[in-house]
C-alpha cells in the first residue's frame, strides 16, 4: 500500500466503503456510485485489479473543478490496494469522483444524504 498524499482526518472512520476496478472493465469503478451520511468520516478502500494504472479522487462538488476531499496515489494492478479517509460534505447532495489518469472517462458519484 502506498502512502496517501492527503492526511487523514483526526477522527476514526464510522463507515468503510469498497470500490474496485477489474480487468474485465478496466475503465470503470465498481460500483459506479456510493452512498454515505453527511458530515461523516468515511474510509474508501480502492482495489485496482486491472493491469492499467488508476487512482480514485473525491471532490467537494458535482465535478472535478471542486476541491479534492481525498485521493489515493496512482496504483498499477492487478491487486494494488489503497485506502483514503475523509469527511463527507455537510450538505447533502451528489459529489463527483474520478480517476486522475483517465478523467471523465472513469468517474462516479458519491451520494451524500
Locate the predicted segments by residue.
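Solvent-exposed coil/turn segments that connect beta secondary-structure elements
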Residues: 22, 49-51, 61-62, 102-104
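Extracellular/periplasmic metallocenter environments
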Residues: 4-5, 9, 13, 76-113
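Beta-strand signatures of extracellular beta-sandwich domains
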Residues: 55-59
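Beta-strand cores of secreted/periplasmic/IMS beta-sandwich domains, seen most often
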Residues: 32-52, 82-90, 111-112
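Surface loop/turn signatures of beta-propeller and other carbohydrate-active proteins
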Residues: 71-75
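N-terminal edge beta-strand
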Residues: 10-41
Amino acid at each position: 500500500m502506498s502512502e496517501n498524499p492527503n492526511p487523514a482526518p483526526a477522527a476514526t472512520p464510522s463507515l468503510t466503503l469498497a470500490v474496485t476496478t477489474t480487468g474485465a472493465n478496466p475503465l470503470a469503478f465498481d460500483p459506479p456510485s456510493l452512498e454515505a451520511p453527511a458530515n461523516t468520516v468515511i474510509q474508501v478502500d480502492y482495489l485496482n485489479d486491472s493491469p492499467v494504472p488508476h487512482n480514485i479522487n473525491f471532490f467537494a462538488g458535482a465535478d472535478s473543478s471542486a476541491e479534492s476531499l481525498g485521493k489515493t496515489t496512482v496504483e498499477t494492478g492487478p491487486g494494488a490496494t489503497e485506502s483514503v479517509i475523509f469527511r463527507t460534505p455537510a450538505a447533502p447532495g451528489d459529489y463527483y469522483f474520478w480517476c486522475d489518469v483517465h478523467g471523465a472517462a472513469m468517474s462516479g458519484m458519491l451520494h451524500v444524504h
